[in-house]
Amino acid sequence: MYRPDLLAFLLPLLAAPVFSAETLDCGKIRADGHTFDLSKLGGPHSVVTTRYKPNPAGHYNTTYTLDVCKPLKKSGGSKSECPNGTRVCAITHLLKSDGDKKEEDEVTDIVAIAGNLENAGGSRFEWTPTRLSTAESDSDKKKEGLRLVLTGGKDPLSGPSKEKTDQKAIIEFLCDPNKEGTEGEWVSEEKYEKRADEKKDDDKKEDGGDKDEGESTLEHQLKHENASLIWDGFEVEKDVGILRLTWHTKYACEKRDESGGGGSDDGGDNSSSHWGFFTWFVLIAFLLIAGYLIFSSWINFTRYGARGWDLLPHSDTIRDIPYLLKDFIRRILNTVQGTGSRGGYSAV
């Protein structure tokens, strides 16, 4: 028969690998004894996919935007956006043109995939990190990096609960020592507030290197040749909408390099992660002395039935230590102070 209070204690432990929004620090993502620093990848980053539908004719472009460090914040006042607290958002545009008329842009779908969306019709934001090199899957063990699962979204956010589909994003950060992680990013229609250093590179990303696969009815990514952020798919699996992304970056490398990539084992700095020789010497000496005292006390108790101070080895010497120290200190004081100015003779 089990105790209810014991069950209440064990249930939180079973969910230990899942973390809440308050504990997400992109600069210190700990997974299986290793700490990854993804703070340099903070800010909004987007991938854009396209799909052509012949009837009615038009291109459906979907912009998937994420921020691994904090919720997305729109720079404008457009209503076509995910609610506050969203970290991963998908917005679909229908692009169509009628002959010589101007091309029309219509927002057809908005999906909040992950974020703290309890107040918007979704659920609580949770994230699960997995260190690929020590994962259970054989295919993952061949990789170096981090898998991050982000949850909290539902589609649609409004309406009866039974009509809502849970959403989540699975992002694999793979080690690439030659990539910062911001290369080849496609400029999307959605405008989010960026970090100052990202705004300086916007003009460089708008020219050259485009890769479009033409009038395809299958959803595919619009990307440059050197793209670091790759879209792998967005499909419903077991009643859950799952967005899969792969992010090639040096910040997923486990070995720290001179340019700041990688993380650290045990969540500590290299200078404090190893003990020095003196520390080990003191520790071993303490253990040896403690072991000697315990073993000798046990011998004295079992063989001679000793009690109290008699249990300790050399108990007579130990008892005399205070008196020996007192006599030793007295001799030192007499030597330092001397016998006065009588030339070594005492008064009669």
UniProtKB/Swiss-Prot annotation:
Subcellular localization: Cytoplasmic vesicle membrane; Golgi apparatus membrane; Mitochondrion membrane; Preautophagosomal structure membrane
Membrane topology: Single-pass type I membrane protein; Single-pass membrane protein
Consequences of knocking out this gene: Does not significantly decrease the growth rate under nutrient-rich conditions.
Keyword terms: Autophagy, Cytoplasmic vesicle, Disulfide bond, Glycoprotein, Golgi apparatus, Membrane, Mitochondrion, Protein transport, Signal, Transmembrane, Transmembrane helix, Transport
Domain MRH: 24-255
Disulfide bond annotation, renumbered to this chain: C26-C69, C82-C89, C175-C253
UniProt KW Hydrolase keyword: no
Stretches of the chain found on the membrane's Lumenal side: 21-274
TM spans (from-to): 275-295
One cellular component (GO) term of this entry: Golgi membrane
Region (Disordered): 180-219
InterPro entries named in the record: Autophagy-rel_prot_27, Man6P_isomerase_rcpt-bd_dom_sf, MRH_dom
Span of the signal peptide: 1-20
Topological domains, Cytoplasmic: 296-348
SUPFAM superfamilies: Mannose 6-phosphate receptor domain
GO biological process, one term: protein transport
Glycosylation sites: N61, N84, N226, N270
Residue ranges with Basic and acidic residues bias: 180-208
Function of the protein: Effector of VPS34 phosphatidylinositol 3-phosphate kinase signaling. Regulates the cytoplasm to vacuole transport (Cvt) vesicle formation. Plays a role in ATG protein retrieval from the pre-autophagosomal structure (PAS) and is especially required for autophagy-dependent cycling of ATG9. Autophagy is required for proper vegetative growth, asexual/sexual reproduction, and full virulence. Autophagy is particularly involved in the biosynthesis of deoxynivalenol (DON), an important virulence determinant.
Family: Belongs to the ATG27 family.
Subunit relationships: Forms a complex with ATG9 and ATG23.
Name recorded for this polypeptide: Autophagy-related protein 27
Organism: Gibberella zeae (strain ATCC MYA-4620 / CBS 123657 / FGSC 9075 / NRRL 31084 / PH-1) (Wheat head blight fungus)
